[in-house]
Amino acid sequence: MPGPAAGSRARVYAEVNSLRSREYWDYEAHVPSWGNQDDYQLVRKLGRGKYSEVFEAINITNNERVVVKILKPVKKKKIKREVKILENLRGGTNIIKLIDTVKDPVSKTPALVFEYINNTDFKQLYQILTDFDIRFYMYELLKALDYCHSKGIMHRDVKPHNVMIDHQQKKLRLIDWGLAEFYHPAQEYNVRVASRYFKGPELLVDYQMYDYSLDMWSLGCMLASMIFRKEPFFHGQDNYDQLVRIAKVLGTDELYGYLKKYHIDLDPHFNDILGQHSRKRWENFIHSENRHLVSPEALDLLDKLLRYDHQQRLTAKEAMEHPYFYPVVKEQSQPCAENTVLSSGLTAAR
């Protein structure tokens, strides 16, 4: 019989929720106040997800453009969790702002109202980003992650679809907190979170005692896809194949080292499909089309994010201190940074 997996705890912000009152993290006890959806006139559908339909809308009381996320029938507990987390994070750096919680007067269907972001579809946007743009937006995303982690919250679904970018205004917002959860040390979490291409190895090997570092893996996948112009970077056909794709880059010996450290037993199905792979050098992914986006600092940062061992990954704060971001930090520390950032030139930041 396989024994129990070894424990693990976050390297940072581990006790944040224990130091807060129960009211802060006990979302099941939370009673959201629901206003009337009649204040909002739906304009057009922006998209649909597994759990919701999203619309651009107008607040008829003040003519403000907003986004209305109408929630599909789902457990009350999940809705309470999302609302509580959004309320706790309100005003946080680069976190989408929850404006209102409303219900349709007839159907009683709950909906969340958010600030509107004039988003550019990432498939188009990622094709035109400069080296400096990538550094800039990754830094802005790290601000959002460090903020939510410092508040005791893991996002658990970091991916391009959930990162809204208004490229004109150089504005980034981390959205969709529907899978987010409060971090408590030694708690075992559901591994059926995140989207396949952005799932950390811990999820793929069924290791439940994960933490904020899961979000750092997903951010690493985004960084890799941006600098190498390969979207997604790890392109698995299913959850099993996803780990195989990762192992082909990070190596199988390294994977077994990770499993051994945490006493993780691998699903026997992997015996047939994993094979043996040596660790690849990040330089192998450079070609003529992406060379202008890759630098030694970019590869060094990537290497420190895409680690099997979740405890070895950089934290959001550590990542923000990496030399890759020096040009961004330098620009943001200048007076009138608002104006200079529009140049998006690496030269301007040196």
Swiss-Prot record:
- Annotated positions of the Phosphotyrosine modification: 13
A GO term from the CC aspect: protein kinase CK2 complex
Query: What are the EC numbers?
Result: 2.7.11.1
Phosphoserine modified-residue sites: 18, 21, 288
What sequence ranges are listed for the domain Protein kinase?
A: 40-325
Q: Which residues bind ATP?
A: 46-54, 69
Activity regulation comment: Constitutively active protein kinase whose activity is not directly affected by phosphorylation. Seems to be regulated by level of expression and localization.
Family matches, as CDD domains = STKc_CK2_alpha (cd14132)
Q: Which PANTHER family does this chain map to?
A: CASEIN KINASE II SUBUNIT ALPHA (PTHR24054:SF34)
Additional facts recorded: Can use both ATP and GTP as phosphoryl donors. Phosphorylation by casein kinase 2 has been estimated to represent up to one quarter of the eukaryotic phosphoproteome.
Q: What is this protein called?
A: Casein kinase II subunit alpha'
